[in-house]
Amino acid sequence: SNVGKPGDTDAQRQFIDAGIWRYHPTRKAFEIFARGLSNPWGFDFNDYGQGCATCCVIPHLFHVVQGGTYHKQARPHVNPYIYDDIKTIRDHTHLSAHGGARFYLADVFPAEYRDRLFMCNIHEHAVLTDVLEPKGSSFIGHHGDDFLPTNDLGWVGFSVCLLYTSDAADD
């Protein structure tokens, strides 16, 4: 696809066949953040500004840095001069089809959930967690617990949104 900000001509748009892009609504600026991946349906930043993406079909967890070129499902990369693409950081597998990604940064759940990456798994009908362990300049993603197994084939989680509210009456 040729992607750009609203109103751009085809000549102003950038080609992207897989990856993560972002648009700044007040500056009206479009940029490709990273290339590769396959259906990165979840992306979030942790407390330290490190981004992680969850993907569908291919290995599910990637530490994403701006400008990186990552493993993808099909076709050669747009840039023929890369030596190799950046691989997954996970050391385990879930069933395929992940959707959503959210680092838990609040303090309502027990302390062991802080900084975990929450994601939905469409085929498992569950909300799962991964625990990131620093390794060199990146991480290893370990399997956390299955936070919310639904045991309901009708429940297909796709997006993860964590809401924190405080009620002054509780104080």
Which ranges hold each PLM region?
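Beta-propeller blade termini and top-face loops
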Residues: 1-166, 171
